[in-house]
């Protein structure tokens, strides 16, 4: 039987030396949102708790000022 190799999770923000996550940085935020609009949990992304809290706050701020959608576009 073949064994599956799991890729080691790491925090991208720690590796890059990011101090604060900006709510205006949409390219970064979109990487942590599912196609339905949910915030991806840190156990899947590998993000540290400190940055996960900042990420959640930044996503919620971006949603509030209508930069990011709350949900997907509901087209059938």
Curated annotation (Swiss-Prot):
Q: Which Gene3D superfamilies match?
A: Ribosomal protein S18 (4.10.640.10)
Name one cellular component (GO) term: cytosolic small ribosomal subunit
- Which GO-annotated molecular functions does the record name? small ribosomal subunit rRNA binding; structural constituent of ribosome
Key words, A-Z: Ribonucleoprotein, Ribosomal protein, RNA-binding, rRNA-binding
Known InterPro entries for this protein? Ribosomal_bS18, Ribosomal_bS18_CS, Ribosomal_bS18_sf
Could you confirm whether the keyword Plastid appears in this record?
A: no
Q: Name one GO biological process term.
A: translation
Function recorded in the entry: Binds as a heterodimer with protein bS6 to the central domain of the 16S rRNA, where it helps stabilize the platform of the 30S subunit.
UniProt similarity note: Belongs to the bacterial ribosomal protein bS18 family.
Describe the subunit structure: Part of the 30S ribosomal subunit. Forms a tight heterodimer with protein bS6.
The record's section on PANTHER family has:
30S RIBOSOMAL PROTEIN S18, SMALL RIBOSOMAL SUBUNIT PROTEIN BS18M
What is the name listed in the Swiss-Prot or TrEMBL entry for this protein?
A: Small ribosomal subunit protein bS18
Species of origin reads: Marinomonas sp. (strain MWYL1)
């Amino acid at each position: 039987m073949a064994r599956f190799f799991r890729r080691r999770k790491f925090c991208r923000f720690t590796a890059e030396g990011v101090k604060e996550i900006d709510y205006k940085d949409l390219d970064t935020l979109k990487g942590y949102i599912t196609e339905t609009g949910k915030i991806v949990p840190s156990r899947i992304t590998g993000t540290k708790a400190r940055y996960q809290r900042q990420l959640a706050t930044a996503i919620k701020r971006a949603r509030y000022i209508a930069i990011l959608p709350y949900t997907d576009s509901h087209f059938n």
